[in-house]
């Protein structure tokens, strides 16, 4: 357990693994691919309601995480895709807020401290500003209902009426969240790239992350999704690809693996071929260990 940091350096790299058969299986699957971080769904992501977690499942999950050395700060649960915390219709908004609070409660029961979610969509029925304010209020309500868990906003590709693709959207939400200690950001490299922030070269990465720091603040970065993109720059389309096989290329992922600003947070693959996740993790880790050796 104690040797994980020594073996893997300061980077916590994994993938979004299946929780089929119970959430307690997720840490086992993560370890099979050589991960020291992972993401999961704590319930079926395409259903509104799930039966409560059983005590034996909660205990088994915690025991497996402890046995394999996974800390809560390196586990990134993702909420249901159905939830829209900026929904313009009251009924959908109330349903989304109740479901989000349930997701946060499940994280708390499992001893987890992060909950990753897509911010929301205005559906062309309200202004961007109104939608962003509604999202922030949804986070505030969840914070009041459930302790400990940090709401981690994922930037989006900008498809349709989804908000969160501009760094300014993220900053505007955070600005209206009352408890700043319990809000953060997960940057998805594919989404960032297709939203119009270039990542193809080291210089592009320097510029994009400097812009994120200026607008949002690097101290809010709690996690990353490492994905290449099947579609071209600034296309506003979300299509993930395996690392180095898409439009972004390896330079970006080498940059992240070598930059200490991305130490200590979950770096999660959502790439399209689970058969090569271990290979992708090993390549990222090799870049990181090289940097440590040369520093």
Swiss-Prot record:
Catalyzed reactions: Endonucleolytic cleavage to 5'-phosphooligonucleotide end-products
Binding site for Zn(2+) 3: 191, 238, 240
Presence of the UniProt keyword Transmembrane helix in the record: no
Annotated binding of Zn(2+) 1, by residue: 78, 118, 154
EC number: 3.1.21.2
PROSITE patterns: AP_NUCLEASE_F2_1, AP_NUCLEASE_F2_2, AP_NUCLEASE_F2_3, AP_NUCLEASE_F2_4
Cofactor(s) the record lists: Zn(2+)
MF (Gene Ontology): deoxyribonuclease IV (phage-T4-induced) activity; DNA binding; DNA-(apurinic or apyrimidinic site) endonuclease activity; phosphoric diester hydrolase activity; zinc ion binding
Entry keywords, A to Z: DNA damage, DNA repair, Endonuclease, Hydrolase, Metal-binding, Nuclease, Zinc
The organism's place on the tree of life at top rank: Bacteria
SUPFAM superfamilies: Xylose isomerase-like
GO biological process: base-excision repair
Annotated Zn(2+) 2 binding sites: 154, 188, 225, 270
Entry's cofactor comment: Binds 3 Zn(2+) ions.
Annotated transmembrane regions: none
Gene3D superfamilies per record: Divalent-metal-dependent TIM barrel enzymes (3.20.20.150)
InterPro entries, A to Z: AP_endonuc_2, AP_endonuc_F2_Zn_BS, Xyl_isomerase-like_sf, Xyl_isomerase-like_TIM-brl
Pfam families: AP_endonuc_2
UniProt function note: Endonuclease IV plays a role in DNA repair. It cleaves phosphodiester bonds at apurinic or apyrimidinic (AP) sites, generating a 3'-hydroxyl group and a 5'-terminal sugar phosphate.
UniProt record similarity statement: Belongs to the AP endonuclease 2 family.
Record-given protein name: Probable endonuclease 4
Source organism of the structure: Vibrio campbellii (strain ATCC BAA-1116)
UniProt lineage: Bacteria, Pseudomonadati, Pseudomonadota, Gammaproteobacteria, Vibrionales
């Amino acid at each position: 357990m104690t040797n994980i940091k020594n073996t893997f350096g300061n980077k916590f790299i994994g993938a979004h693994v299946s929780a089929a058969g119970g959430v307690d299986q997720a840490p086992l699957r993560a370890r099979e691919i050589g991960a020291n971080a992972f993401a999961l769904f704590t319930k079926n992501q395409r259903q509104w309601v799930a039966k409560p977690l059983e005590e034996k499942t909660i205990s088994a999950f915690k025991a497996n995480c402890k046995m394999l050395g996974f800390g809560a700060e390196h586990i990134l649960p993702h909420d249901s895709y159905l939830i829209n915390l900026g929904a313009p219709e009251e009924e959908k908004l109330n349903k989304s807020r109740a479901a989000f609070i349930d997701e946060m409660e499940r994280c708390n029961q499992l001893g987890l401290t992060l909950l990753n979610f897509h911010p929301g969509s205005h559906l062309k029925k309200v202004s961007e500003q109104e939608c962003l304010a509604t999202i922030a209020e949804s986070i505030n309500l969840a914070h009041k209902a459930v302790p400990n868990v940090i709401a981690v906003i994922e930037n989006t590709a900008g498809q349709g009426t989804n908000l969160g693709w501009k760094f300014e959207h993220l900053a505007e939400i955070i600005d209206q969240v009352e408890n700043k200690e319990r809000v953060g950001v997960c940057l998805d490299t594919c989404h960032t790239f297709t939203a119009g922030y270039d990542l193809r070269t080291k210089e592009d990465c320097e510029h994009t992350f400097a812009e994120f720091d200026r607008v949002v603040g690097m101290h809010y970065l709690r996690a990353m999704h490492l994905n290449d993109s099947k579609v071209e720059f600034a296309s506003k389309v979300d299509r993930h690809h395996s690392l180095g096989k898409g439009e972004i290329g390896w330079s970006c992922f080498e940059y992240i693996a070598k930059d200490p600003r991305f130490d200590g947070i979950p770096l999660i693959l959502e790439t399209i071929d689970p058969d090569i996740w271990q290979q992708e993790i090993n390549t990222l880790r090799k870049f990181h260990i090289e940097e440590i050796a040369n520093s």
